[in-house]
């Protein structure tokens, strides 16, 4: 599974976590039960989001300007959490993370949402 596919699985896992209020370990097991190979990166990202969720949301909220994190859809929240944890906590290359997040937004969100995702992650 390449990194884009891993990020897609993570977006789905984070979405389930946010929407269904499931335990993060239960979400990981649900994804794993789909016969997918889940690697250390997957677990590291989920654990880091779980451990720093409030801090990440605060930083996202600051970058949203006239918007509020809670008003965003769960998919948008999931993409922003994924991107923010990779940029702020895991120190991945910001340009690559933003590009991947924009791709996910173009595939799974409303037409113009990718611009919001791009702008927020760029400000982090």
Where do the PLM segments sit?
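N-terminal interaction/assembly modules
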Residues: 1-124
């Amino acid at each position: 599974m390449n990194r884009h596919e891993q990020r897609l699985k993570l977006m789905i896992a984070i979405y389930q976590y946010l929407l269904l209020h499931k335990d993060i370990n239960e979400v990981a097991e649900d994804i794993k039960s789909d016969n997918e190979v889940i690697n250390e990166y997957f677990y590291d990202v989920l654990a880091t989001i779980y451990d720093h969720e409030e801090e990440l949301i605060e930083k996202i909220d600051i970058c949203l300007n006239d918007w509020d994190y809670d008003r965003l859809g769960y998919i948008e929240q999931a993409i922003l959490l994924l991107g923010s944890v990779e940029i702020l906590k895991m120190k991945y290359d910001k340009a690559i993370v933003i590009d991947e997040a924009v791709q996910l937004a173009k595939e799974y969100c409303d037409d113009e949402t990718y611009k919001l995702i791009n702008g927020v992650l760029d400000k982090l």
